[in-house]
């Protein structure tokens, strides 16, 4: 009985922590800073620099969690993630532009536009098989789109999850 009460208490505490993080993310998004292209590019640069600084740690964590060699860890996860971030950095302005789209004749003389706007707060849940790449690439995409993001790394890759947490905390300190 005592363990069930303790487990329930821990779940409630985790839930309140999740709610606190979500509210902070929503409040930050409401400030409107993420709409600016310069802000997005700066965040992507910080993310890239932090990944480069923790590159060896990521590869070691992937070896510990999944038995991947350092070469495989770099080629299949770190290198691809860095390439994605660099591509997003180069193209974030183009991705954010309003585009003209065709409209049907039934709506003549209307004009159609596709306006790229951030959603707000997004969630990234990483699987166990590519825990670094499939957490960081969607995070980078969310940042490039102007969203705030909550990242939930895989529980089945604890060493990699710890490195991801360190990178995210280094790049995006709370507050």
Regions found by a protein language model. Name each.
Residues 105-175:
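Rossmann-like NAD(P) dinucleotide-binding subdomain of oxidoreductase/dehydrogenase enzymes
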Residues 1-113:
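N-terminal Rossmann-like NAD(P)+-binding subdomain of aldehyde/semialdehyde dehydrogenases
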């Amino acid at each position: 009985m005592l363990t069930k009460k303790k487990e329930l208490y821990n779940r409630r505490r985790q839930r309140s922590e999740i709610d606190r993080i979500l509210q902070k993310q929503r409040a930050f998004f409401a400030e409107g800073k993420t709409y600016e292209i310069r802000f997005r590019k700066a965040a992507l640069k910080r993310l890239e620099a932090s990944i480069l600084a923790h590159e060896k740690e990521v590869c070691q964590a992937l070896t510990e969690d999944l038995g991947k060699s350092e070469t495989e860890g770099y080629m299949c996860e770190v290198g691809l993630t860095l390439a994605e971030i660099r591509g997003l950095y180069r193209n974030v302005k183009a991705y954010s532009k309003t585009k003209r789209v065709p409209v049907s004749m039934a709506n003549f003389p209307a004009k159609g536009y596709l306006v790229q706007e951030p959603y707000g707060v997004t969630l990234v849940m990483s699987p166990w098989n590519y825990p670094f790449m499939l957490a960081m690439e969607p995070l980078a995409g969310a940042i490039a789109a102007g969203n705030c993001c909550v990242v939930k790394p895989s529980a089945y890759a604890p060493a990699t999850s710890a490195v991801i947490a360190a990178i995210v905390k280094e790049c995006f300190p709370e507050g």
